């Protein structure tokens, strides 16, 4: 694969399944800027990991303190590796005490639907 996004097109073109991950966090108002910065750094680092097709964070339009994550991974092994990376562990640890709540991580298997 030449890159995360190019790899995603390759996987879909050949009909491979992928792993989708969603989740959200609600930042405290007084820590939002620091939490957002940490989220953006985490996303940028994660995008360079093997098997990462996409990794994004978005601000919720209805509640700007909520940050929503959407990730696509080539397979479960890539996701397990991502969770085991020291940077991922440090990110989760950093968030503790800076957020009000989390929706938890939801993980799905997805496959392309033929057109």
Task: Name each model feature, range by range.
Residues 45-53, 72-106:
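An amphipathic, aromatic/His-enriched active-site/gating alpha helix that lines ligand/cofactor pockets
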Residues 23, 35, 39, 55, ...:
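Hydrophobic pocket/interface hotspot
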Residues 26, 58, 70-72:
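Short hydrophobic/aromatic beta-strand micro-patches
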Residues 43-68:
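Short, glycine- and small/hydrophobic-rich beta-strand elements in well-ordered beta-sheets
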Residues 10, 15, 57-65, 92-115:
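Glycine-rich beta-strand-turn "strand-cap" elements at beta-sheet edges
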Residues 1-17:
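N-terminal amphipathic/basic-hydrophobic helices that include classical n-h-c signal peptides
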Residues 19-25:
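Active-site-flanking beta-strand signature of metal-NTP-handling nucleotidyl enzymes
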Residues 27-35:
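Short, surface-exposed ligand-recognition loops at beta-strand->loop->(often short) alpha-helix junctions
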